[in-house]
Each structure stands twice: as C-alpha cells, then as structure tokens.
C-alpha cells in the first residue's frame, strides 16, 4: 500500500501518531513510497525509521529505483545519492561487473536510507523501436537481459535489499503504456517462451530466492483467451508463473492507481 492509503493524508512526508494508529488499524505487510514522499535525506531516514518502529512485524519499505528514468530517490539531488544511468546503457556495455556495481550503488543508497525493497530490476526484453519499456530494459537479447538482471538481483541482495523482477510475463513488445490505458500483447505462449519469459525463467531457476515478481496489467488474449489483465489472470499467475516456472515466492501486481 501507499502511506496515503492507510493514513488518508494527501501526501505523506512524516510518520507520527497518524501513521502509528493507521498501522494498528491496517497492519500492512509493506509500504511503497514515491518521489513526492521523499524530500531530502534527513526527512526520508526519519520517515522510514519511524514507520518501521510502529509496525509489530517488520515492514517491507519499498521504492521504484531502477536507475535511469525511474529513480524516485536518485532523481532528487537533495537525497545525496549517486546517479545510476539507464539499463539500456548497461546492456550496451555487456559487462556484468558494471551491472553489479550499478546494483551496489542503488542497493547501498537505499539501505542507508532505510529501504529494504526495490521494485527492480526490469527483466523485460525490448522489442522494436516503439517498445514502451525503452531504456528501462537491458536490450533486445533475452539472454543478455537474463544475465544482467540476475546480476542486479545478486548485487541488491548483497546490500541488504530485496529485489523484484518485473513486469511478468513481459512488457517488451507493448507499444501502449498501461499507465495511459489498456495495452494488449498479441503474442502466443510459445512466442513468449522464446523471448519474454527467458529472463524470468532463467533468474527464477538460478536465483531460487528471488523474493518478488511483479505482474503487469497488460492483456495477453492469445495466451489467456480473454482481455483480462495479466495480474488478474489465473492463466498467467497460476498456470504459468506458479506452476510452469515453479515460482513459490511473493507475487505482486503493478500499481492499481494506473489508468
């Protein structure tokens, strides 16, 4: 949940008695923060420390910090953290050591602030000039995406940060941003298996403890037989992710505040 969802404030930048009472009433498992919640380093540390102290069971405190265009923390110069470039640039280097260093920078910065969950890395395979995922992806080679996303998982873990692969079962061929409306991917399951699913399958198999997988809002009618969004589809979540890929850890949806 967002802090606003349980406290009913417009923008949560402090955690005090209102947050304490909210967590007593709504014992959430985790809270996700956005740029609007994070004003500067000192404020963010206090916000997260206080929030965590009010929870009877330790919370996941998460943020979208991919590097590049999706950097809720790194995009704010007042946070005093190193800026990490986009994943496409890392993909072009084809250097696992560079990817590991980027993950260390991100993970170390988040851990120092009090976060313990990063909704990253992006495991999507960019396909075509119109791909919405763009520079957020490591590139168009499924094996490269699998390798470098797996490296980020390891480096985040080394810094005490839980990772989340996204956006299952693959956002790379989408040409409409699902923040702006319904997006349909016409691929069949065999086509997904030959490209989009490769990074997810590889990382889940080799990194059995990858803690989270985020499922997208995209529709895959040639897989599910309907326009049901992936994160509401038993065919996607249960049949493919749980059963076929044997993923047994936490599955989370993309934000339901999107269009």
Where on the chain are the PLM-derived regions?
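Short, acidic/polar
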Residues: 6-24, 98-109, 194-200
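Second-shell residues forming the walls of enzyme active-site clefts
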Residues: 7-11, 15, 39-55, 59, ...
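A short aromatic-anchored loop/beta-hairpin motif
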Residues: 21-35, 221-222
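Active-site-adjacent structural elements in enzyme catalytic domains
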Residues: 38-60, 67, 94-114
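A substrate-binding/cap region within the structured catalytic cores of diverse enzymes
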Residues: 85-115, 120-153, 157
